[in-house]
Amino acid sequence: MSVRKPKNLEPKAADLIRDLYKSYKYYKRRFGTKDPVFFMIAAKTIEEIGELANYNPAYMPKGFDSTKIYAIRNLIAHEFSQHSTAKAIWSMINGGLAKEMKHFY
């Protein structure tokens, strides 16, 4: 039996995502993209953004589609150690997230 999370419980979801993205950019500048520490921080940040976006669709900006970020979130959460999925995660970390976040600004 599946346990589903209720939707639209966090009215500040867009603000939380914006804050997570700001911290993501800070750590990217601080560590650089080749550092494994940044890889872990970025992966967890994208995972959290995907969760917030998927479970709070009513509070997302107009035109924002959470499916790509949530798909990457699933890759991170479930198949993080696989080489092929690691490449997909790196592509999201190195530019894909910035494209998706344009809806928040």
Kindly give the residue locations of the regions a language model identified.
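Solvent-exposed interaction patches of small proteins and small membrane subunits
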Residues: 1-105
